[in-house]
Amino acid sequence: MGQKFSIKCKKQSKNKNTSKCQKIPKKAYEGPPGSYMVKAKYKYAASGDTDISFEEKEIMYVLEQFDEFWLKVVKQKDNKEGLVPSNYVSKQDGSPQSVEAWREIQRWEAEKSLMKIGLQKGTYIIRPSRKENSYALSVRDFDEKKKICIVKHFQIKTLQDEKGISYSVNIRNFPNILTLIQFYEKNGIGNTHIPLTDPMPDNYQPPVHFQDIEINRENIEILNEIGRGFFGSVHRAKWGRSYEVAAKMLQSSKAEREKFVLEAKIMHKLRHRKIVELLGVCTEPQDMPMLIIVEYMKNGSLKEYLKTPDGKKTNLNQMVHMMAEISEGMAYLESEKVVHRDLRADNILVANDLTRKVADFGLTELTDGSLGDQEKKTLRFPYKWTAPEAAKSKVFTSKSDVWSYGIVMFEILTWASSPYPDIPAKEVIEKVSKGYRMPNPEKFITGVCCPDEIYKIMIWCWDANPEKRPTFLVLQEKMDLLIVDTLTNNAYYSHSK
C-alpha cells in the first residue's frame, strides 16, 4: 500500500472559474487496528501452508504473537496473511534494534567486521554497550597520517522522561535512532566529522525455528551423510522447500525417546548466535531412527577446519577470536544451567561466515549433571578432555566443562593436535589426578605461539579444585580483553585504505 493522496482545490479569485489544486498527502497507513509494523531483515521462502514468503525490507503488520517464535502478519503490499519467523523481522519502533545497522555483537566483533577490505569510510554498526542505559555506534574511518583504517566508537545514551524514550550522542538529543542516523549522514560524527554512509552488510541469516518441537518426517528430505560419531550418523538434509539443516540419526527405545523429547523441549528454547540451535526432532514412526534437526554448518567441525589449508594459516589473533566465540557460547549455556559434558574442537562447528558455534550440548542432560546408577556404568567420555573429578564420579558440571575448555584452547593453538600426545588416553586421568599438566605447547610443538598470559588461563582452567576454576563468563571477559589488547596494538586489523 503506497501513500494515498486527496485533492484539495481552492478558487484563485471570485472573478475566475479556474482553481488551483494541490495534492495533500493523507496520513500514512498504520495497518489494521491493534497491529504494529515490522520490516523484514532477510528474504524468506515459505515452507508450508501456514507461513508466507516475503522479501528483504518488506513491510508487514503483526496481528498477533502466534507462539514464542512465530508471528501472524498481514503484508502491506498485497494484504496476504500468514505466519512469519519472528527472528526474521524487526519492530519499527524507532529503537536501535529496528534499523539495518543493528548487530547483537561485542566491540571486538564490530571492529573485526568493519576492518574488512572493501568497505568504505563511514560504514557503521549499532550494537549493545556494556555501559548502563547505552548503545554504541561503531564507525569505520581512515587515519591519513598513519595510512591505516581504524574504527571509532561513540556512546549512544538512552534517555527517558514523561514524553518517552530518546537518544543522545554527546549533548545532542534525537527522538529516535533513524533521526540520529540521518543527522550524522548529513553532518558527520566525531572530531573528524565522519559522514555515516552505509550499514555494515549482514551476511548472517539465522535459523528458522519450527513451529512445533515434533516435526513431520515427511517434511525432511535426507541427503548425504556428513559425519558419524558415538551417538549415530549425521546427514545434510532439507526442510520444506529450500532450507538446509543437519539431521542426526539415533537408534533409541521408546523410553529413551520420551525422555529425550522432554529434554529437547527445553533445549528448543535455547537461542544464541554462538551455539548450534536445536530446531526440532522426529520421533515417529517408532520403527525408524529418531532424527534430531539442528542448524547446518557447511564448514564442518573446528577440528576439521584447523587441518585445512586455510585453517593452517590461522594466526594467534584469529585463534584468540575462536576462543572468545566459544567462551561466549559456553557462558550462555552456563547461564541456562546447561552442562555440555563433551566440549572438544570436534564439537565446535564452523558456520558459513566462519563464526564458531558450540554444538552437541543437546545430547546432554540439562539439570545438575547427575546420572542414574545404570547410566554411570555405561557412560563413555573422552578421557583427554574430561576433568578428573568428572571422570571418577561421572558427575559433570559447568566447572568440568571449563577444564575441557582449557583443552580446546590447546587444540586451537596447535591447529587441532591431539592433547597429551605421548600419553595413552586411559592413563591421562591418573596422571592429571597426581598433578601432571601439559606444558606450554610452544615448548614441545614446532611453530606454536602461546604467550604466558594465554597459558596461565589454560592452567587456571585445569585447577585441581573445580571451585577455583573460572566461570565461562569470566573466561569470556578475559578473552575480550586479550582481543582489545591486540586491536590496540594494530597487530591484526590495520591495513591500507
Curated annotation (Swiss-Prot):
UniProt-annotated stretches for the region Disordered: 1-25
Reactions performed catalytically: L-tyrosyl-[protein] + ATP = O-phospho-L-tyrosyl-[protein] + ADP + H(+)
Disulphide-bonded residues: none
UniProt keyword terms in alphabetical order: ATP-binding, Kinase, Nucleotide-binding, Phosphoprotein, SH2 domain, SH3 domain, Transferase, Tyrosine-protein kinase
Residue ranges occupied by any Protein kinase domain in the UniProt entry: 220-482
Amino acids binding ATP: I226, G227, R228, G229, F230, F231, G232, S233, V234, K248
SH3 domain span: 33-94
Ranges of residues in domain SH2: 100-200
Name of the top EC class for this enzyme: transferase
Active site: D342
Classification via Gene3D superfamilies: SH2 domain, SH3 Domains, Transferase(Phosphotransferase) domain 1
GO MF entries: ATP binding; non-membrane spanning protein tyrosine kinase activity
CDD domains membership: PTKc, SH3
One Pfam entry name: SH3_1
Enzyme Commission identifier(s): 2.7.10.2
Classification via PANTHER family: TYROSINE-PROTEIN KINASE
Family: Belongs to the protein kinase superfamily. Tyr protein kinase family.
Listed name of the protein: Tyrosine-protein kinase SPK-1
Biological source species: Girardia tigrina (Planarian)
